Amino acid sequence: MGQKINPIGLRIGVIKDWQSNWYADKNYTELVHEDIKIREYIENKLFNADVSAIQIDRAANRIKVTLHTAKPGMVIGKGGSGVEKLRSDIENLTGKKVHINVMEVKTPELDAHLAAKSIAIALERRVAFRRAMKQAVGRAMRQGAKGIKVMCSGRLGGAEMSRTEWYTEGNVPLQTLRADIDYGMVEANTAYGQIGVKCWINKGEVLPEVDENEETKEENKEKSEEKSE
C-alpha cells in the first residue's frame, strides 16, 4: 500500500499532522466546503508566492490560517498591506474573524510541492521534461535530501501517445513510517494538454522522542536485574 497511497496521509498520526485542525459535531460538511473555498482562493490569489502548505485551525467563530511560503515578502506586502487585504477577503468569504500567520519555507528545494511546481512551470515554458526533472532532482540532493523521486505523466514532448517517465536519485522508502517523506502533485497546462507532475522527497528518518523518565526507569530495571543475578 505504501507505493500507492498518499505518503502524507499514511503518516498522519505517526510523524505528520492534519492540515485542518478542528472539531465539529454539526455543520461538518459546511466547514469542509469552507476550508476548500479558503484553500482555492489562497492558491489562486498567491500563485506566484510559492505557497507550499495551508494550515487551518478553528475555534468557535474564529479561523487561524497559517501559510507556509518561500516568498513571505510577496504575501505580507508593503507595510503588511498584502496580508491585511487577504485577511479581509477571507473574512468576506466566510463571514468569520480570520487571523493569518505567514511562515517562511527556508529551503524550497526540499519542499515536494514547490519542486513539482517548478517542474510544471518549466514544462509550460517548453523546457524539455528530462532536463526539468533532472534540475529539480539535482537542486534537492544538493540541499541535503536523502532521496527524491519525480514522475511526469502525459503527452511528454508533444508525443501523440501519453506516457509516464520517472527520475529517481537516492533512497525513498515509502513504507517506512518513520521516514519523513514529503509529497507534492501539480498539473502543468501545456499546448498539448495537461501533464501531471508528482514528487516524493525523503528528508531522513524521524525518530520518536524518548521520555527521560521512561529511560531512567529502564536503566534502573536493568541494574536491578543484574544485581538479582
Swiss-Prot record:
Statement: the UniProt record of this protein carries the keyword Translocase: no
Listed transmembrane segments: none
Residue ranges with Basic and acidic residues bias: 218-229
A GO MF label: mRNA binding
Biased composition (Acidic residues): 208-217
GO biological process terms held by the UniProt record: translation
Record's signal peptide: none
Keywords attached to this entry: Ribonucleoprotein, Ribosomal protein, RNA-binding, rRNA-binding
Origin superkingdom: Bacteria
Keyword Ribonucleoprotein: yes
Residues annotated as domain KH type-2: 38-106
Region (Disordered): 208-229
This protein's GO CC annotations: cytosolic small ribosomal subunit
Family designation: Belongs to the universal ribosomal protein uS3 family.
Biological role stated in the UniProt entry: Binds the lower part of the 30S subunit head. Binds mRNA in the 70S ribosome, positioning it for translation.
Subunit note: Part of the 30S ribosomal subunit. Forms a tight complex with proteins S10 and S14.
Stated name of the protein: Small ribosomal subunit protein uS3
Species of provenance: Natranaerobius thermophilus (strain ATCC BAA-1301 / DSM 18059 / JW/NM-WN-LF)
